[in-house]
């Protein structure tokens, strides 16, 4: 290969790796009765004056009414700020995000879940991550579409569920039912993320961690996750045939750590975005918040601090590199692509000889278009002349590593 070609490859790779997607802003939902009953899954509430009477929130009650901007202002938070600085059952999560350098907001009980609506100052397009901790109100068709478009276009969605029969506002729907309805009953794509929540209720501390050395959720900046503590939670079933990107990272005790059932924590990709899901809200509970609720610290003391590690590593994974490449920060780069954008043919050049592996090309929905086994090739030629213009993802998996890069087809 000529030096000129090597330089071109380096320039192209560098350009794509530095494109920014958006500010690092995280939105915590408070519009789906997250503070109903004995829950208080908000990062901060200055007022406690709403109630849930078999449905949405209404003024007249004692539940947390989270405002858009937490107070005191997050600019005053330091590395030593305690979680009681804000008043909410998941304030520690929010304050940890601020300490990491993120900006956090709450979507109030009367806020709107939209995508691409410029008149909404809290439109999801303004955020990198959307956290929904145990929703208790069904999403509307329009809200489902907005959330799926948010993920498709590079956003990160953190889905927190709870055990079956945990309807807190008395409307007949619990978080397991609501999340499954979101994924299976929408106008965009059925089961887009490749998993569903089971209707279970169990408690355990599990050390059944998937063996994935490069996984950011398990081995991220907050440390190595060695266990997780559930107190009344549920598990998930995976469907890799629907979305090959889905992966269980923590499993129920006694289950296979590589299987498709009994997953306690899951990650997936959809379009350019990412999804993280956990089957219990108690790991996020920091034990302080609404004085009318009985809260327990699962965030710091749960599983000897591992609950916090898992949640913050997952938040970091969702927030980082949600850019136009759509590639995880922890994936090992195994190859270069030339040219990119491409018109007729792509050349994939592995950095080292790949004795055994797989090359795949997928569209923006994660649907596999091309798959080829690799056996020592020094380069791969891919004809893209018949593909529609747009964004695609080229991946090479080899010896336990997977590298993915975005390509653009432009005829």
Sequence positions of predicted segments:
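Extracellular ligand-binding/catalytic regions of CAZymes and related secreted enzymes
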Residues: 23-84, 99-100, 189, 256-335
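Active-site-proximal beta-strand/loop segments in catalytic clefts of secreted hydrolases
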Residues: 29-32, 107-111, 132-136, 160-165, ...
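Helical hinge/lid and interdomain linker segments adjacent to catalytic or ligand-binding clefts
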Residues: 74-180, 185
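Hydrophobic/aromatic beta-strand patches that form the interior of the parallel beta-sheet core
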Residues: 27, 105, 158, 191, ...
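Bacterial Sec-dependent N-terminal signal peptides
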Residues: 1-24, 367
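C-terminal outer-membrane/trafficking sorting elements
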Residues: 330-411
């Amino acid at each position: 290969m000529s030096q000129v070609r090597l330089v071109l490859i380096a320039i192209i790779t560098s350009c794509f790796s530095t494109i920014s997607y958006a500010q690092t802003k995280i939105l915590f939902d408070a519009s789906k009765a997250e503070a109903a009953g004995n829950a208080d899954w908000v990062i901060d509430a200055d007022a406690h004056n709403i109630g849930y009477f078999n449905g949405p929130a209404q003024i007249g009650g004692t539940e947390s009414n989270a405002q858009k901007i937490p107070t005191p202002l997050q600019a005053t938070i330091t590395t030593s700020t305690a979680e009681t600085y804000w008043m909410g059952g998941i304030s520690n999560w929010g304050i940890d995000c601020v300490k990491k350098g993120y900006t956090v907001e709450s979507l109030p009980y009367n806020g709107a879940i939209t995508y691409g609506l410029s008149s909404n100052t809290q439109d999801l397009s303004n955020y990198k991550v959307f956290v929904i901790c145990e929703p208790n109100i069904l999403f509307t068709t329009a809200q489902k579409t907005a959330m799926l478009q948010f993920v498709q276009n590079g956003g990160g969605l953190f889905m927190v569920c709870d055990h079956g029969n945990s309807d807190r506002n008395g409307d007949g729907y619990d978080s397991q039912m609501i999340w499954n309805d979101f994924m299976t009953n929408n106008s965009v794509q059925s089961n887009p993320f490749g998993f569903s929540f089971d209707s279970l209720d169990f408690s355990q501390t599990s050390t059944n961690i998937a063996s994935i050395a490069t996984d950011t959720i398990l081995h991220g900046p907050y440390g190595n996750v060695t266990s997780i503590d559930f107190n009344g939670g549920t598990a998930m079933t995976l469907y890799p045939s629907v979305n090959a990107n889905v992966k269980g990272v923590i499993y129920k005790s006694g289950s296979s750590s590589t299987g498709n059932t009994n997953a306690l924590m899951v990650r997936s990709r959809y379009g350019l975005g990412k999804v993280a899901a956990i089957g219990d809200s108690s790991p996020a509970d920091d034990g302080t918040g609404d004085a009318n609720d009985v809260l327990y610290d699962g965030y710091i003391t749960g599983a000897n601090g591992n609950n916090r590690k898992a949640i913050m590593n997952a938040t970091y994974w969702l927030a980082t590199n949600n850019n136009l490449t759509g590639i995880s920060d922890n994936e090992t780069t195994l190859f270069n692509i030339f040219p990119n954008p491409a018109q007729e043919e792509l050349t994939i050049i592995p950095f080292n000889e790949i004795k055994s592996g797989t090359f795949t090309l997928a569209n923006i929905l994660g649907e596999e278009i091309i798959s080829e086994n690799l056996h020592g090739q020094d380069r791969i030629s891919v004809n893209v002349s018949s593909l529609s213009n747009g964004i695609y993802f080229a991946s090479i998996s080899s010896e336990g590593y997977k590298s993915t890069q975005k390509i653009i087809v432009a005829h």
